[in-house]
Amino acid sequence: MIVGMETENTKNANHRTGGAARRVVELSHPIRHGMVTYPGLPAPEISVHLSREASRDHYSPGTEFHIGRISMVANTGTYLDSPFHRFGDGPDLAGLPLDGLVDLDGLVVRTVDAQDRAVDRDALLPHPVTGRAVLIHTGWSRHWGTDRYGAGGHPFLTARGAAWLAEQRPALVGIDSLNIDDTDDLARSAHTTLLAAGIPVVEHMRGLEQLPLDGFRFHAAPPAVEGMGTFPVRAYAVLPGGEHQR
């Protein structure tokens, strides 16, 4: 039994560091055996490499461990795309500077009530995005885990919107939708433009409705895996105490 660990019910509770209250907001989907992230891609397979029972033969009485095994495609759950995902000569996961993935000044662009599923430049123009983690809140994450999520008609960033962002140089762009591109656009204009500019992309986010428009720090660092362009991340935001949605 583990004593003193944070439980599911307290993940978003207030924490105190140096006397100042803060709140941590989960922005990633849990990865579960057999779950579907993107239609057509295989689901993760989670199994046991070494069971607790089998491990007892290797240790002192009363000592046991569990070693798990997971087989999955890189595009599973909430994940980050590096330029290598699109371009063979771009930085892979290990080539991304860590300071461009963590403790970023966060900004939410809310398009939940928009009539058009296309997030165009006009939705972005009012926002100072340079150097920030720009998180596009479409509300599509409410369909996660249902057939609707991957059935088409998801919100996406237009080619014009991506081009404007690339010019403004945000640190990172995220979205709570199936794909940052319209999947009917086989050129994948948003991926192509942003990753060519060296701007990482985080897809399949959740929980953006819990964030204010700004005033929070964003974190989304994948493992430093060489030769891979995409991998799941534990994305989260840190808010000062007393922050609320607006």
Task: Mark where each language-model region is.
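Active-/binding-site microenvironments in catalytic and ligand-binding cores
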Residues: 1-246
